[in-house]
Amino acid sequence: LGEPDGSISERAKMIAGHIEAGGMPTPVIEDIRRTVWAKLMGNITSGPLCILSRSHMKATLADPAIFAAAVRVAEEGAALARAYGCDVGTGAEGRMRRSATIAHKPSILQDLELGRAMEIDALLTVPLQMAKEAGVPMPTFELTAGLATLAATSAGLYAPPAG
């Protein structure tokens, strides 16, 4: 939990305290923007690839070609974050190596498996729009997001906006 201006506010501490009282650890951090960008980078790399493989990260990233694509998407995501003033650091390959050890199914894959509406716009469409607005090429992510969107549409779990 954090404030957009990077401060540790009493408000954030109070909200965190209430959440923690319910049993969920809730750290208050200074650089919430970096944390949000890091989360988005995880979503754009793992979500589409796991939708396409219909499997968790460990199985998906075991294939060298898919692993290489994930690294490229992570690098594209880092470039997008930098374009918006947030340096999430480098080390896309290291992040993907860590992800490749976890048998985690991203929530968007869980939605597909359970027949629930999928968050295509928030997790895929908006980052692509932001990339276009910032002039950041994301060809690998554009491909994986397009295929994942088609999979969601074909499953009846996403309806692209009209227009």
Where are these regions (language model features)?
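NAD(P)-dependent Rossmann-like dehydrogenase/reductase catalytic/cofactor-binding core
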Residues: 59, 68-163
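Internal alpha-helical scaffold of NAD(P)-dependent oxidoreductase catalytic cores
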Residues: 1-88
